Amino acid sequence: MTDEKFLDKKMDRREFLKKAGIGGAGLALGLSGASAFFANQDSSTKKALDGDEDISFYGKHQAGITTPMQKACYLVVLDLHTTDKKEVIQLFKDWTDYSSKLVEGELVKKDGSNALLPPTDTGETVGLNPYRLSLTFGISADFLKKLGLESKRPKLFRDLPPFPKEQLQDKYTGGDIVIQACADDEQVAFHAVRNLIRKGRNKITMKWSKSGFAAIGDRKETPRNLFGFKDGTANVTTEKEFDKVVWTDSKDWMKGGSYMALRLVQMHLETWDRTNLQEQENTFGRYKESGAPFGKKDEFDEVDLSKLPVDSHVRLAKEVDLPILRRSYSYSDGIDERTGQFDSGLIFIAYQKDPDRFVKIQTNLGAVDKMNEYITHIGSGLFACFAGVEKGGYLGQA
């Protein structure tokens, strides 16, 4: 997953532009107060489609949601260890300041002349451009509870119910804050999260994290998961669809935000690899090579449910008829010590204006989805991702 540009010793893009003279252009704590997908022109990212333009941290909505997918994702879930609202507001202000610089490829802070002090920025991206870095933040219902803000919890912000067949592990379940860092370079994404966490070390600890990757090619093809099937074909792709499916239109502090359903899905690759092609395709209800639904020729042809096995993944998901925006990444963490097999799977991320959309889909999949023979849901969380930040403002200020 190493980007060729990472090893390029030539002058970086930002330095070239400078030399050429071109130049680059309360937390609701006050709370009262994919093929076509990769071509969508989200307002915060429409200049980033060539892979070389920065993605602004500021805007009506947070970047990293409808933003065209990047090649790498570093996701971390954090536990909060303060009940002081003022401390959390300051943390979110600091994160806003850091994030606005990180997405532009700048140091989080320039250091003084005292070499006996640790550098403020860890420095592993010096000389690199931002590689379309986006940073997305969300909070859980437990976050509100810890700060005595349960009365500010939106009605839609309900806990995810138990689902059939899941085997959730405590270490991958729950948490108070999520940070999703995506970029076209793995080290850039990690650097961003590392420095954000470093800034808040006296208030937060890491609960769990995963480094993900996506085979997005030139962004014109839907990425494939580790089972070799295209993942995200049915995604919504237009601004009109985003308003209908992704962005909340509530009158509370979540207006303009989105709910992230997060699932850590372990994929049993060795079992899958021993399964014949016909059975694999029956599991999905799509042809493996083309991604077309059964009975059709093209990936994006309309699905005819009558042509799909009754327990196929696509049929069960389509029966609910509630679109969501999938933004998932594959992961591989070496070897599972218990089994000696690959510890690999999917960081399933779905955004929607109402979490009930995801709940209804997953409930329909839970008991009879043939996919359950090859996967196990081991982690879960639901996070409210704020609306975007205007310049001069800070995360969660609505």
Can you name each region flagged by the protein language model?
Residues 18-34, 45-398:
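Long, histidine/aromatic-enriched segments associated with O2/redox biology
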Residues 1-15:
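N-terminal secretory signal peptides
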Residues 39-41:
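Short hydrophobic alpha-helical membrane-entry/anchor segments
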